[in-house]
Amino acid sequence: MLTFRKAEAKDMMLYFEWVNEKLVRSQSFSTKPISLDDHKKWFFNKIKDQNTIMLVFSNGVNKIGQIRIEKYSKKKAKIGISIEKKHRGKNFAFKMIDIASSYFLDNNTDFALNAFIKESNKRSIKSFEKAGYYLFGSLTNKKNKSFHFIRKIK
């Protein structure tokens, strides 16, 4: 059974490992590895930030991955996901996206969730579509062609 909880200070190194995993870096808009010092500052600021929700997903005792949702304007938030390498390809992504999106939108009914995904990231595109996101448009973000997907309250 897939469950989630809010990220805590004890998750800092787990997030550090996930964020620097090779495939995660290659699908990010900033592909350079992240230093531990930079990550620590970022992580501890984010878990305290009232505009950010960081969720750790588990399947029993196994940590599956994380989703981060950040409010960036009055009625807009962006969502991002990463899955532990050994749990990819097991249909966790769309379930995590759907659960986290519903959790956020149930508590923020006037918001739209926005996902910005590299054109080359076919698995993420499929997962977001399966979780109820629709293609809003395409753009070039930091020299990367990407798609903009949106989900609003159902």
Regions found by a protein language model. Give the residues of each.
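Hydrophobic alpha-helical core bundles mediating ligand binding, dimerization, or RNAP-core interactions
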Residues: 15-20, 39, 43
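Residue-level marker of structural boundaries
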Residues: 21-24, 33, 48, 88
